[in-house]
Amino acid sequence: MFQLEQLSIAIIGLGYVGLPLAVEFGKQKPTLGFDINQQRIAELLAGHDHTLETSAEELKQALNLRYTHDFTALKQSNFFIVTVPTPIDDFKQPDLTPLIKSSETIGQVLKKGDIVVYELSLIHI
């Protein structure tokens, strides 16, 4: 089990759930925000969030938050929080592709003892 000071946090998916979570963690602890969308990473590095989930001021306050689209940077982390979308398909079933792909990505860098937390929002219609 990790001591709190040993945690190296990575947030996977910087959407409406992941970015605010990464910002709050990044105000307190070293945190890596990962997203496969290079444009998303570029805008966050420029201090802008087009989704308006966080303000420019909040982004500035997260002094311990780094952003990347390079999955190899995840090797430094030992606590992963996955916040990828689970959209509904034409048959009103959740599309788990983003969840599966992010799990495969983490699996490439996962070490014994690492922790993975999944935060999923599923809408049943």
Regions found by a protein language model. Name each.
Residues 83-84, 120:
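Glycine-rich, N-terminal phosphate-binding loop of Rossmann-like dinucleotide-binding domains
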Residues 123-125:
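Conserved small/polar residues in nucleotide/adenosyl-binding loops
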Residues 18-19:
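N-terminal Rossmann-fold NAD(P) dinucleotide-binding loop
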Residues 14:
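Glycine-rich Rossmann-fold phosphate-binding loop(s) that bind the pyrophosphate
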Residues 3-7, 30, 36-79, 85-93:
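Conserved N-terminal Rossmann-fold NAD(P) cofactor-binding segment
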Residues 111-114:
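A short helix->loop->beta-strand "cap" motif at the edges of active sites that frequently abuts
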Residues 25:
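Aromatic pocket-lining residues of Rossmann-like dinucleotide-binding sites
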